[in-house]
């Protein structure tokens, strides 16, 4: 990394910290609103706004420009809420009124079976609460994450994530060869896996997603088959009052040798598509998913 890039990353990090400091006198509700609106304003000026619009038009070809713009504006606001909520992630998990849970019967059945499972979700609402929630409810979980380029922000985000964990049994591991090893060791030691499976994986398999063949991660399905792990959909949405709602849906199985990984991923993608169509404002449209 060159000196100038390092210096730029440092400036970005200090700017972020200064903004958070300046918001200190305001309530969390007001601060979150300021950050979310700022994200929307700045986001609309960035190149990612057009990427988001193109993605949205592909998924909703019948919507007009005004309707598409509204979805993308709300998506930018959701990202702003996420960024601010990351600064007090641990407190969010302690607030019993902030996160509403549905599908508790599914979760309790998994608890009683006491076998590792694969939880999956998408970049929707505040996805950062998922792993700490599982950990705080006694589900030892390993999660793979993609590090961001800014090393200072990356360190800060990692610390916020790990500080929100209740135990030392759960962990985060950066995507790569090391993560594959750590995740497998976790399964062997009766730990669960949590994955966000909606983003592009250049090394992945081409699977239909909203009618288009896209590179998709399917490696976790090989683990599910080998260790006979249930695959649990974990839907996550942001409610109108800015609270969060997590729904545990009925587990999927991948123990039929006649069903390929691609076919099973197609089933998972159909679940993801349903979630996105139900709550389009919540999804991370800015990612080059269909490129």
Per-segment meaning from a language model:
Residues 51, 150-151, 214-217:
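Active-site metal-coordination segments of metallo-dependent hydrolases
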Residues 99-100, 124, 150, 173-177, ...:
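A conditional alpha-helix N-cap/helix-loop micro-motif detector
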Residues 113-175, 202-206:
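Catalytic core of membrane glycerolipid acyltransferases/transacylases, capturing the structured
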Residues 21-26, 126-128, 153, 181-194:
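Short, composition-biased local secondary-structure segments
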Residues 2-121, 156:
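Membrane-anchoring hydrophobic helices of lipid-metabolizing enzymes
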Residues 70-73, 109-112, 136, 177-291:
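Non-catalytic C-terminal accessory region of glycerolipid acyltransferases
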């Amino acid at each position: 990394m060159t000196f100038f890039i390092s210096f730029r990353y440092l400036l970005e990090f200090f700017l972020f910290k200064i903004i958070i400091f300046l918001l200190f006198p305001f309530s969390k509700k007001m601060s979150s609103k300021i950050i979310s609106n700022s994200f929307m304003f700045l986001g609309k000026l960035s190149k990612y706004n057009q990427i988001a619009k193109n993605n949205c038009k592909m998924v909703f070809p019948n919507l007009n420009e005004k309707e598409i713009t509204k979805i993308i504006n709300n998506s930018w606001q959701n990202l702003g809420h996420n960024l601010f909520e990351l600064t007090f992630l641990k407190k969010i998990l302690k607030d019993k009124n902030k996160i509403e849970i549905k599908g508790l019967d599914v979760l309790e059945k998994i608890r009683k079976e006491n076998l590792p499972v694969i939880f999956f979700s998408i970049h929707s609402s505040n996805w950062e609460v998922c792993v700490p929630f599982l950990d705080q409810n006694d589900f030892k979980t390993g999660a793979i994450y993609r590090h961001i380029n800014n090393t200072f922000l990356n360190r800060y985000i990692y610390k916020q994530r790990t500080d929100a964990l209740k135990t030392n049994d759960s962990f985060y591991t950066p995507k790569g060869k090391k993560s594959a090893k750590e995740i497998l060791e976790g399964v062997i030691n009766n730990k669960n896996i949590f994955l966000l499976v909606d983003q592009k994986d250049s090394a992945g398999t081409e699977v239909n997603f909203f009618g288009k063949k896209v590179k998709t991660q399917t490696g976790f399905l090989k683990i599910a088959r080998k260790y006979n792990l249930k695959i649990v959909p974990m839907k996550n949405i942001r409610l109108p009052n800015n609270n969060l709602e997590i729904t545990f849906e009925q587990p999927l199985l991948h123990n039929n040798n006649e069903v390929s990984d691609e076919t099973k991923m197609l089933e998972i993608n159909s679940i993801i598509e349903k979630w996105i169509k139900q709550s389009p404002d919540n999804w991370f449209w800015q990612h080059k998913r269909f490129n």
